[in-house]
Structure formats: C-alpha cells, structure tokens
Amino acid sequence: MNYIKPLFNKNNIKIYFKIHANRLNFDVKNISTSFLHDVKNCHQKFGICGNCKYKIAQDYKNMFDQVIYIGDGLTDRCVADLADVLYVKSESNLEQYCRENNIKYTSFASFLDLYKMFEEEKRNALSWG
C-alpha cells in the first residue's frame, strides 16, 4: 500500500503525478516494508535508503526540463541540490540540512499548504496565457 495516496485523498487532493515511495505491507500480525527502488551501490554519501531518490530524480532530469521535489527527511538530502525546485517540510531534518548547506527551498507545513501553493502557481500561469 502506498501510504501517501490516502493522505492526499483525506484532504480531497487529486493526484496528477507519479508517486515514488516504499510500500507498506500489512498482514494479520505484521507490517513490513517493500523497497521498490533500492540501489545497492548508491554513489551518494548518505548511505542506503531503500528508495534511491537521487536515481529517480536524475532519471526525471534526463526526461524533463525541470525537477520539482517535495521532501522532509534524511533520505531526501541526496536530491536537495539536484532538484530545480525544492519544497521542504518545515522543522524537518531536510530543512536543517538545506539551511546548513545553503540550499534554496520553499518551506511548507502540510500537504494542504502545498496544494494551495500549487493552485496559486496554476492561477498565475493561466493569467499569463
């Protein structure tokens, strides 16, 4: 189960993009995690994270003009300086890392904040059209 989609659904936010995340597997007695994008020999200095976000972001950089990244944790550090636009959860490990390394980002407190920011960007883009 992708645990991000229910968060968006709870806030009535439609998803128009692919989500790359680990999966939570539930059975009667246990919860386990499936790592779908694990890279054993990751070249980043942060160690194995189970979901090589750097590789995914690099793949997108090769396909598109701009990479927009949303993160909050330690495993998001490797993408922080690769993303063209970076949204960082306020008071998170990633925000601390970005401050310490002078990486430009936009802070958000909740997914609802992001939704409002994206809606504003969409309105601005349409007004130029």
Predicted segments with their positions:
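C-terminal cap/substrate-recognition subdomain and adjoining C-terminal extension
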Residues: 1-129
